[in-house]
Amino acid sequence: MQSKKNLLTLHPEKVISKTTIEKHLEYLVMYIEKVNSPQDIKGLNINELNVLADEIRTGVLNRVSNHGGHVGPNLGFTEATVAMHYVFDAPRDKFVFDVSHQVYPHKMLTGRKDGFLKVDDMNAISGYSSPRENSEYDLFEVGHTSTSVALASGLQAARDLLGEKYNIVVVLGDGSLSGGEAFEGLNVAAEAGTNFIVLFNDNGMSIAENHGGMYKSLAALRESNGESSNNIFRALGFDYMYVEAGNNVEKLVEAFRKVKDIDHPIVVHLHTEKGHGYQPAVEDKEAWHWSVPFDLKTGKPKNVDGGESFSDLLGQYLVKKAELDDKLLVVQSAVPAMSGLSKERREALGKHYVDVGIAEEEAVALISGAAKAGAHPVWGTPATFMQRTYDQLCQDLAVNGNPAVINVLGASIYGMNDFTHICFFDIPMFSHIPNLVYLAPTTWEEFIAMEDWAIAQDAYSVALRVPCAVVHSDEEYPTDYSQLNKFHVAHRGSQVAVIAAGGFYQKGEAVLRLLADEGINATLINPRYLTGVDEQLLDELKRDHQLVVTLEDGSLDGGFGERIARYYGPTDMKVLNFGVKKALYDRYDVNDLLRDNHLTETQIVADIKAVLA
């Protein structure tokens, strides 16, 4: 039976019209509103499963258009998710989603549909796999890529050790295969030799286009209907099955039934379409990987910020820099948009551009090698992904002292705020690596001055904490930062010194104004360097200051402020450190976070006055 007024797509080869979604949400009563667990779809026939897939796709579009989120990955894996839950028996069978960019349909089928159908409930549901939502269907908190196979290999080892019987099903995207941990997991799972089903979701895309030699092999498999002898999965020790119609529920159900309860590892290669069912997402797969809230009819953002963005300015800068510097090598790891590198700008960079895929470890080793060979490499990626390559930062780069440049993006409480994507743990990570200089520019102009110096110099590995907000200044900044750890005194006063780092420098200026209203002429310092202290200046402050205040847009534990407090430890100088306390944060409200950590300007001033009293 089909929906009485199902004007949505009833077949996977068709495309949902941009004009139908909102007015047809009211008709989502045939199947999805009655589904509270995968058991509720077991009795449906193929035609009914197709209708269910359409209803799920409509729910996905309802959420992302109102709340923002991952668009293309979820639309492209809708049919496969329906087929998974129809054939396999979760939660007894274990599903592990890589990066979980495609987890929305899964959530709708496992009791969380209200987070997609009802606008008021959307904040309650994470955009990622999350057992914290009290769901037995989500096994792991997942948000970074290439981890699913390794996590699932642990399930495999425990299942086999305990003599249990269930299917382990891994959802792995082709973009995720560019990360080394995916291969480590595949290697281990293949050697175990027991039930281990990898659903390889191949839509020919990462976030942007795929990069790497193995993607030619994957293309050959697609073009030969899986018959190519150049099969990377068989070479790793997996059995293999190819499904060309990766957005066809009937074909997927047929394939999954063949591999259910299999007694050895197998890869089921699904050829899917990223953005399937929503034409704008099909036509521009990169732009629609993730989106802010948008108008379904036009595809345009609902809230347009007409101001400058740091990423756009950075992209312009890098293209212009390549025109002036024949040695410049711009390196990305699958997220070029974060550095303002549109497809047109990537093409303009030409040989100056390298994308290593989702492989941050490779990126750091590559820029170290490139610097050694005389290039001027610059790599940028969000701070949350820097955590994936700490060993390479220490060993391959800093120990060797090669003069590569790293742009640490979004490192701020104003950056990404999902549980798995918190971006303010970078200062403890970078600032304690010997032989690496970590700079904290406060404005766009200061960033350019520091970046130009970092690229031109050949003495240090240099990282820059790129501000989130665009702040302009007519101040003349130094062009040489080789005198390390030399802080800049912007305003000299007495009694209280405020050392405000990076993106919190403007907060420091606001605090100074409030203190002036209280009759306190405080000193304001831009430290510029996060990897050391200006001992001479700190000693000078002891003469006519009784309190030093540090402000940092990051973690207090192991942060910049603790370095200042440690220096003053044996002295009579009082120190107040302001930053974010150690905790697990998830989808926080920035204003709440500021208040909870006493980071509003009025709270800071009140705390300063309390110490001085």
Task: Identify the function of each model-found stretch.
Residues 293, 301-304, 415-417, 437, ...:
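Peripheral docking tails and interdomain loops at the edges
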Residues 115-125, 191-205, 398-410:
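A glycine-rich helix N-cap at a beta->alpha junction
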Residues 70-192, 328, 333, 342-343:
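Cofactor-binding active-site loop characterized by glycine-rich and histidine/acidic residues
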Residues 138-295, 300-307, 311-316, 436-545:
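Glycine-rich ThDP/TPP pyrophosphate-binding loop and its adjacent helix/strand module
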Residues 58-65, 124-141, 164-169, 343-354, ...:
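Glycine/charged-rich beta-loop-alpha catalytic/anionic-binding loops adjacent to active sites
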